[in-house]
């Protein structure tokens, strides 16, 4: 089994931090469902402003609120307005990598979804892997992809 990236909210902004809550990150269920994140799923969080890296679990907040709230100890790692990356991972058999297409959502400063991307891995007849980033229209994007919404 290999640990692979399963879903990512890239460039979402922290809307609140609640030190007195007992842990987790509260997210808009609409964002989570579009990316494939489940309630109680463990995620890694990377703060683009400070470089802090933490892990916690997802809880759903109010639908369509565009919330991104760090709770409990996680609240110490992010400030309101910080741009973060939230990433989940799954374990899969290496042979299944070509069947697996994680979703990546990118955001503007108001936490509106700017783009929905997919990571696509294919294996050719010689056994070599090929990686592509594809937008909703099926168009391949250059690698690395520059984040939009800035």
Curated annotation (Swiss-Prot):
Q: Which GO terms describe its cellular component?
A: cytosol
Q: Tell me which UniProt keywords the record has, alphabetically.
A: Autocatalytic cleavage, Cytoplasm, Decarboxylase, Lyase, Pantothenate biosynthesis, Pyruvate, Schiff base, Zymogen
Record Gene3D superfamilies: 2.40.40.20
Question: What cofactor requirement does the entry state?
Answer: pyruvate
Q: How is the cofactor bound?
A: Binds 1 pyruvoyl group covalently per subunit.
Where does the record locate the signal sequence feature? none
Annotated pathway:
Cofactor biosynthesis; (R)-pantothenate biosynthesis; beta-alanine from L-aspartate: step 1/1
Active-site residues per Swiss-Prot or TrEMBL entry: 24 (schiff-base intermediate with substrate), 57 (proton donor)
**Chemical reaction(s) catalysed:** L-aspartate + H(+) = beta-alanine + CO2
By its UniProt entry, which Pfam families does this protein fall under? Asp_decarbox
After translation, the protein is modified as follows: Is synthesized initially as an inactive proenzyme, which is activated by self-cleavage at a specific serine bond to produce a beta-subunit with a hydroxyl group at its C-terminus and an alpha-subunit with a pyruvoyl group at its N-terminus.
Sum up the protein's function in the record's words. Catalyzes the pyruvoyl-dependent decarboxylation of aspartate to produce beta-alanine.
Name of the protein this chain belongs to:
Aspartate 1-decarboxylase
Write down the species.
Beijerinckia indica subsp. indica (strain ATCC 9039 / DSM 1715 / NCIMB 8712)
